[in-house]
């Protein structure tokens, strides 16, 4: 597997964990350190594994359904660091409902940063910014 393939696999695992709302799978994707950060759309930046994990737990508890269609994906690898830039096209429900008539769509542009930890790529930054319908 090439480095680019490894980063793509780690990035795919991140979105699979997010769609499944699986905190254990999400924990497997991330480096557990104080240097990591996450910025969810509309949230302040959170640093450190405890705050990052807490944010995913809150999102998972308050989301009934979420699906991502990723577009304009570009993977860049430089040594033991890599980043993925992409657009997230999101279909989700408000609250815990999974009813089709409760779904809404949105879009965010994202940067996911990974570092190589021995043979694995681990996420250290996820930053997602909302994109307006006009943008």
What are these regions (language model features)?
Residues 1-25, 31, 35-135:
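A beta-strand edge to alpha-helix "cap/lid" segment located at domain peripheries
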């Amino acid at each position: 597997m090439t480095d680019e393939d490894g980063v793509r696999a780690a990035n795919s695992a991140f979105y699979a964990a997010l769609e499944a709302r699986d905190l254990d799978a999400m924990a497997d994707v991330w480096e557990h350190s104080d240097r990591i950060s996450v910025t969810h759309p509309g949230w302040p930046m959170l640093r450190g594994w405890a705050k990052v994990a807490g944010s995913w737990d809150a999102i998972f508890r308050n989301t009934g359904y979420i699906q991502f269609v990723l577009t304009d994906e570009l993977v860049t690898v430089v040594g033991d660091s890599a980043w993925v830039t992409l657009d997230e096209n999101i279909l989700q429900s408000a609250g815990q409902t999974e009813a089709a008539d409760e779904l809404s769509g949105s879009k965010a542009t994202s940067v996911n940063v990974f570092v190589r930890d021995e043979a694995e790529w681990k996420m250290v930054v996820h930053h997602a910014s909302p994109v307006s319908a006009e943008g």
